[in-house]
Structure formats: C-alpha cells, structure tokens
Amino acid sequence: MGFYNSPRIILDNLVLNLDAGNTKSYAGDVSSPAGTPYGYFTGGIVPGSPSESSISQRIDYDSDTTTTSPKGPLSASRRMHSGTGSNSYGYLAGQLPNNTNADRIDYSNDTATATSKASVLVDEANRRGAVGNNSYGYWSGGTPNTTKISRLDYSNDSGGGVLKGYLTQTRMGLAGTGNASYGYFGGGMSRTTMDRVDYSNDTPTASPKGPLTGQRYGVGAAGNANYGYWAAGYPENTIGTTIDRLDYASDTDTCLSKGNLTESKYWVTATGNQSYGYWAGGREQHDPGQSDFSYTSKIERIDYSNDTATASPKGPLAVVVREVGAVSSRANAIPTAGSPSTRSVTQTNGTPYGYWMGGANPDKS
C-alpha cells in the first residue's frame, strides 16, 4: 500500500480516490483477454450425404467434454478446406468446390452466417494447409498441384489475397501451424519434409525444415509458441495414430514421436490454444481391402505439458463429419492479452465534519 499525490491511495493495483465529493472513483486499468476460448470445426462431408455441408460446430475449451454447439453456418457449403485467423476473425478457404473465396467467422458474433470474402487465394485448389499470425493468414499447397503461397491481410480482407513466395515442393493434404514469427507447412502425399515461412520476410521461397517421422497426408496440425504437432493421416494403419512434435527452436531436426491418438484416422482437422490441441473429424482407417470406412465423432485432445501420453477423448462432435476446416482465436500462439479498460468503483463517503483534539492551552504556559 502506498500514497501517491494524496488524496489517492494505491492498494494492490487498485486506485482509490478519497475525494468525498466524488462517489465514483477511478479504479485502475485492467486488460481483458483478447479473442474467445473456443474452437470451430466447419463444413465437411456428413455420412449419407453426397456433397459438402455448411455447418459450423464450436468446442468450448473450458468445458471440452460436452458435445459441440452448432454455430454459423458458413456462407456456402465446403469441404477439404483449411483455416487460420486473428483473435477477432477466423478465415476458411481452399475447398471443394474449387474457388478462391473464403468465409469469415466473427468470433464476437458466431451465431451469424459467416461473411464471404472474395479472391482470398491467388489460385484455386483444395486440400490446402493454412497458418498465420495476428495480422496475416497464409494458404498453400493442395490439388491441383501448386506451390504458390497466398497471403491475406486481415486489416484489408476485402482487398483479396496476394502472392507471397513458394513452397519448396508441391504438397496435397498437408497441414499448417506456427507461432508469432514463423509458419510451418508439413506433410502431404508422399511428403515427410516441412516448409517454413518467415513472416518478417515472406516473399522468398520457404525454407525446408523437419522432417516428420514419416510420410502422411490428410493430417491435422496445431501447436503453441514453442512446439508444433502433426497427428493422424494416411498411409493406412501405419501413421494414423502417430503424433509428431517439431521443436521450433531446433526446426531442422527430425520431429520427435510423442503420444498417440486413440484411433487411426485421416482427413482430420485440428486447432487449439496455448495448452491443448484438439483433433476432430476424419475417417477411421481399417485393414487394407476393407470397404467400411466409417466416420468418427471423437475429438482428441493433446496436452502439450504431457505430450507423451495418449490423447484424451473429448467432445464429441454433434454432427459426424470428415474433410473439415478449423479455426480459433487461440491458435498459432496468437496473443491473448487485450487492450486495457478503465474501471470505477462506488465508494462510501464519510460525514461532512472535521475534528480537532488535544494540544496545549496558551493561558497555562
């Protein structure tokens, strides 16, 4: 406790105004968390349906054992798409049917239909990977084969995307994750390597990194500020439960194998926050030659602080889907600290009196 420019008192960072004529006093600034504690799984193919869907399902990170909540929907049906975004909006792009548009989810109003944004990608492709920071989103790879990297400036998301650099090789069915400085595109059909985009210098060709412990496509990726995780994927029954971890501080090393998912699957998606990654959707894998390719509603959570353990089942999804996209305001180590806001508190005033006590009588001196 301390006194600063009386009549104010600073107590545990709370500023109290002792002016008896002011019943509302300044109570200091407080920073509210940026973004929302949710992840969104969007679109995909529903069992029994021959085409894409526009559904959006939200998982609450603070209550992740409950069934996902219906939100959205997207402005159009889509599958085989990928997402990234800021702490205000999530963007989904690169899909079937092929086009260059994206859907934007407003995290502060997620019951509304997503807003369509034109020409976010510089070329048409599906099965892309996506990654980004709080300012820009990057999409690359996919089929038809392309190495172009599209960048969207979130502050001008009606202006369309621009071409930025290239991957070192074509990739189909890849996944991306990263931190505030770098984005990593990993996997893809017949690919074990990764490509790293430097956000501070994003026009050169991406840098080869990794590799993963094995080839995989239809993979999902998520991570925090220090590590990226790639899990699930194809080939059948050889890679579908494996979790690979990339250490960003040593990103030329081969990924380390960590825990496992509880079931083998591919065409999954993933998102998360600083503590956990969530893998959702997909198609369960079976023995070669088996024709029953069932979908899964299970959401699997990787605990980054204990990543050698088997993933924990969460959710489930309210609607079973595969080939879905995912976004979250907590993904890719996006900052969670918001702008400071001013608080005030009501104080109880004293009485309008003053008192003098003690002292010496001058007649007695």
Task: Mark where each language-model region is.
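Polar, enzyme-active/binding microenvironments
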Residues: 1-365
